[in-house]
Amino acid sequence: MVSFSSCLRALALGSSVLAVQPVLRQATGLDTWLSTEANFSRQAILNNIGADGQSAQGASPGVVIASPSKSDPDYFYTWTRDSGLVMKTLVDLFRGGDADLLPIIEEFISSQARIQGISNPSGALSSGGLGEPKFNVDETAFTGAWGRPQRDGPALRATAMISFGEWLVENGHTSIATDLVWPVVRNDLSYVAQYWSQSGFDLWEEVQGTSFFTVAVSHRALVEGSSFAKTVGSSCPYCDSQAPQVRCYLQSFWTGSYIQANFGGGRSGKDINTVLGSIHTFDPQATCDDATFQPCSARALANHKVVTDSFRSIYAINSGRAENQAVAVGRYPEDSYYNGNPWFLTTLAAAEQLYDALYQWDKIGSLAITDVSLPFFKALYSSAATGTYASSTTVYKDIVSAVKAYADGYVQIVQTYAASTGSMAEQYTKTDGSQTSARDLTWSYAALLTANNRRNAVVPAPWGETAATSIPSACSTTSASGTYSSVVITSWPTISGYPGAPDSPCQVPTTVSVTFAVKATTVYGESIKIVGSISQLGSWNPSSATALNADSYTTDNPLWTGTINLPAGQSFEYKFIRVQNGAVTWESDPNRKYTVPSTCGVKSAVQSDVWR
């Protein structure tokens, strides 16, 4: 988000936010933690989507809020970029069998059709308005000062909707894709084709110029947009004319040793935006293509080392880490927003690129080391040398093992600094790793889900990278006019007959995300925790109790909440405790009792209490 200033953390009406900072944990049992954290992250995303999300009250249906945080910083808005990335994650989960997400995806597309038509400071539907970066959660224009326009949003939104549209066609619902999805997608593609070559603000909302990330995702959107248009019986000539020019321009960001993140801004150009560009244009059918900076390409791997190395010496929490060990990763080394810290999503992006590369090497059956990528490989495997190594060779196996361990190291850093409840804010501090900036950042949770899936070799559908090979002999920053039209989606036809659909046998989940909400008036420095008879609640040990958060606390509604993943059907007893300066006060007897739901399709629950 925009880093206008670094601010003091807010106090919630007498309750210190800092008082409920998580205790840092050692990174153990990564597989087990990821299984639990993935479930938590899925629910945390749903909590941040209107109108029914627990943390998105007041947001219109389908609107994805960036964070529930309303002060220091205020992220209670919907960003087109964040929403597109988050929804693409949910669409991928849906295509993988998570049928419960269908109505959320439909509501998202309906909401975006409405938002596209809102006149705003960047313009109207057909005059640049799609480049407006953020809106109020009630689908009204945000008219305050901001870094606008931002041109990555329409491309990312188009990619998310195209993926769902392709699923519709593949499952016999072509008319829905044609009548409801394509018109909304076409607006975004028209914007990308018209404005891709013009300057705008980067994804961090700070640098005005042209950005690698924006150009990369624009290229992808135009390529898959053209294919999707043909699938629904239409065409996208403006996609076809501009995609080769965008691909040509993309090459200009390569410096010879790393990817220049932005043209403009006066910084070194070493920026995780380049790694994000690589992972969000990853095509599981692609080779290690330098032209599109595929994750396993020599360029992308060389860039990964340069970018991640730029954070090794500037964060105290990275002290003592060897060259072959993962580090906490921020946005760019010159960052000063909230004093310039590592972010959860950027650290996870560093891991995800490596998991993508591992998938690509396995699919190709070999890996190649060039002069460009040699520094990356030598840092992890000291005897690395240029050449191509088949998957049957010892060198290949040793390198793959080293890269896998290196990738896991980034996720273990996230595991260490995530809250014991699973919560992830935007950032964790460079000095001690305590969480800071906006709480429960939706993008953080989406990044966890995508990194975890790639680690498990669960990959998205291809987007056509292998067919997008044309590069003009001379680049030209051209543009093309498309077709804009106002779209109103009043309702969605019933979609049935697919795995997990309402008419299919329903599955009882193995775990349920239970949110405990207790009203307890507190004073400055006092916190509320939950402790109980099961290990997830500390086995009645106050020192192992789970801290609740006071982010929704007001004088009229002194609410403390926390979400914990628990086994379905588990019965247990619990109590709330007050903790201040190490002193523990238990609430009065009797013990509270609760049984986790074990019901078809129920993956979350809320238990509301009042302190006694």
UniProtKB/Swiss-Prot annotation:
Span of the signal peptide: 1-19
Gene Ontology biological process: polysaccharide catabolic process
Record: glycosylation sites: 39
A Pfam family assignment: Glyco_hydro_15
Gene Ontology MF, one: glucan 1,4-alpha-glucosidase activity
Any single Gene Ontology cellular-component annotation: fungal-type vacuole
Positions of disulphide bridges: 236-239, 248-475, 288-296
Prosegment residue ranges: 20-25
Catalytic activity from the UniProt record: Hydrolysis of terminal (1->4)-linked alpha-D-glucose residues successively from non-reducing ends of the chains with release of beta-D-glucose
Record carries keyword rRNA-binding: no
Keywords assigned by UniProt, alphabetized: Carbohydrate metabolism, Disulfide bond, Glycoprotein, Glycosidase, Hydrolase, Polysaccharide degradation, Signal
Family, similarity comment: Belongs to the glycosyl hydrolase 15 family.
Protein name per Swiss-Prot or TrEMBL: Glucoamylase
Organism: Aspergillus oryzae (strain ATCC 42149 / RIB 40)
